[in-house]
Amino acid sequence: MWFLVFSIWIASGQLLPHISNVIEKELDQLEITELSREYINNKFPITQSSCVKNALGEFLEICMRKGFEFVDADLRVITAVRLSVCEFESSGLTNYPSECHEKRLGGIDTISCVNALESSPQWWTTYSGNYQNLPHICMENSLPFEKEQILELFLNITDMYSEFQRNIENYWKSFSSDLEINGKENIDMIQNLFNSLVNDLIQNHKMKDEELITEFDKMKAEFDIRFFNFTESFDNLNDEVNEDLSLIKSHLIETFRQVDSEYMAQLQKNKNSTDKAFNELESMSTYILDHQKTSMELIDSFFSDLIDLTRDKNLVISDELMQTQEETIHLIFQYNKLVHESVIPLLTDDLLPVVRGVSNSIVENLDNMNVELTSHLENVSQTIEVKFKALEKETDRSLLKAKEVESNLRNLNNLVSTSLKGLQTIVRLLTFLLKRQVVLVGILQIFLRKYISMNLYLYAIAVVVTALAGSKVGSWGSLLMKSFVTR
């Protein structure tokens, strides 16, 4: 750090003369104000003085800032007169009234000039037109006036910047002269400080090296002694941990075997019940099909017998009617009108009741057969529906049991995988701790600044490991019990 500061001071001391020469050369150039005014006059000819500009100067200032209504009547008259004079001079007319000359307008009353202009129609027309056009002139010349105001503001800023530049140049001259005077003294002082600092650093470095070598020799001797003690303790602890892990492993294997056998028995039992339910379902479906087939055969037989019986009765009735008709026709032809009148009522009274009785009996038989067939079909459909519902419930129950068995087996597999992973993690943790416990003892002694015996450290590690193993085994045992209770 001191070396960096020293280098900066040396570089600044070398650059000071060059900077001073550059500043002196720049001071000989033209000032910014003169250059700015020359540039503006070349690029903006509006800033150059003219007759119309001088005539409208005071009028436009009030008109643009406040409005045409705030312009005084006398100022309007003076402005119109000045514009008329500018128009006369620009057209080459020199014999306009002497009362209206520019040099006399500021010190005399404008009434005499207006009266003089009134004497000639041409003069009065020019004055009247300019007076009436003053509002339009205010609006038309607003942009040049604003430009002029902006340029004036720019020139004011340029003047201020030029003054600021001159102040900076004067300050820089005084600062550079003071810097050149004090530079050598500061460099000598920094050189002395740097030399003393380097000497102090060299002495401190030598002392620290000697202290570190002595401390390292002590730590090496203590490390050899503790490492020898640690190897003996580590062998004993390793044997104890291996025995504990062997016991835990054998216990877990036995537990897994018992759980596996119980789950296999439960699975076989559920499988048998499922097979039995499927067999019952199959036999029930076979019975229903046979019963349905028998019912359909009975219905076909019943309708066939009914049709045959109806056909026979219709044939008998038809034959009887034909015979009766033949006999009647024969009697009609034999006995003529008298016989006809006596026989027809007799036949009518005898045959109509017989025909009506036979028809009524046929209709009643058909209605009874329809009612009996409908009730029988309803009973058969209800029986089939009840048996199908029972069969569906048995099937759902069997599927639920199979899903429960599958879920229990999946949980058991996850539990076994988690247990094995936990054992592997504990073994890796023990190996890691046992390999690095010497370094941990050294770090603890450095932080606590106190000697810790190897026996005390190994006892603490044994307690922590036993607690971790016990908590893991306890959690696995509780998970196994919960799974058995749930099952």
Swiss-Prot record:
Domain of life: Eukaryota
Side Cytoplasmic, residues: 472-487
Signal peptide: 1-15
Family statement: Belongs to the KAR5 family.
InterPro entries from the UniProt entry: Nuclear_fusion_Kar5 (IPR007292)
UniProt keyword terms in alphabetical order: Endoplasmic reticulum, Glycoprotein, Karyogamy, Membrane, Nucleus, Signal, Transmembrane, Transmembrane helix
Membrane-related topology note: Single-pass membrane protein
Protein name: Nuclear fusion protein KAR5
Function: Required for nuclear membrane fusion during karyogamy.
Organism annotation: Kluyveromyces lactis (strain ATCC 8585 / CBS 2359 / DSM 70799 / NBRC 1267 / NRRL Y-1140 / WM37)
TM annotation in the entry: 451-471
GO biological process terms, semicolon-separated: karyogamy involved in conjugation with cellular fusion; nuclear membrane fusion involved in karyogamy
Gene: KAR5
Location relative to the cell: Endoplasmic reticulum membrane; Nucleus membrane
Ranges in the topological domain labelled Lumenal: 16-450
Gene Ontology cellular component terms for the protein in this record: endoplasmic reticulum membrane; nuclear membrane
Entry keyword DNA-binding: no
Glycosylation sites recorded in the entry for this protein: 156, 229, 272, 379
Main subcellular localisation: endoplasmic reticulum
Keyword match Cell cycle: no
